[in-house]
């Protein structure tokens, strides 16, 4: 008979009441391999990895998606092969994990380096092997990565990890989203009024293509005109909008959004993005990343965190456009 759904599909309980894995009893496995013993159902790993990859692609079918396997969960050469064959990248956070993945034949373009205490040797290996990205976890890292990349004559792909202040479930002791925890760079400056981000609740149209978050129709302009008139603005104007508050069609909602953007502009995360941008000869900024917690079923938390990341993205692009209006910048 089958066991609880939490067990792999290949698990069952036989007539004698013994747990079996693909027909092999647990006792026979212990007799052959000894104890303690980890038993991994590779069919289950492959099936789950494939489902995650396909689900992400289907949910966000208007953009490119990457799903990463956290190497810290369990990393062996065979696991590396299975998850990458299923379409996943692999997150590594130590020299050992990096070496295991590379020994399994995983190319650098399928690997990511995480960690809040990276050694120079780990950064150097990631750059040499052309890792998909190095996730910047603290303000001093861009300078270190840039120095090593310059010495190697290469350009490193980097992504910034941001603590968004949104936490999706899980125990407080293992939370990775709060502003005062050890991973990532805070979105807001210390003591900032996070209540100003309530303007994000009114956003109705957030698209990867334009990245211009729109306020709902309830936000009427100062002169009483329909807010939908903003849709007629050309992209060049929109990129710095709503900082240009002198525009005749600026609404109260625009002003609230500008206030939120100004607060983000004063935050640590934006400062690090600007530092990376200044080093673009050796650093390629490929995106921002926020880990909000362990409860993957908390859809509202993911939506709120995504809105905050879009606000950071919009603020960064606005500042770059104002300072260098002719330069085109792409950030995912």
Model-derived regions: residue spans:
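Single conserved hydrophobic/aromatic residue that forms the stacking wall/gate
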Residues: 320-325, 329-332
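Conserved beta-alpha junction segments in alpha/beta enzyme cores
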Residues: 238, 246, 267-278, 290
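Short beta-strand segments
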Residues: 70, 157-163, 289-291
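Phosphate/diphosphate-binding glycine-rich loops and adjacent basic-rich segments that engage nucleotide
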Residues: 157-160, 164-188, 237-238, 242-244, ...
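A structural motif corresponding to the C-terminal end of an alpha-helix
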Residues: 59-62, 268-285, 315-319
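Short glycine/threonine-rich loop-to-helix capping motif typified by GTGT followed
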Residues: 297-305
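Midchain, well-structured core segments that form catalytic/ion-binding scaffolds
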Residues: 307-314
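A charged N-terminal "starter" segment
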Residues: 1-157, 172, 193-207, 212-215, ...
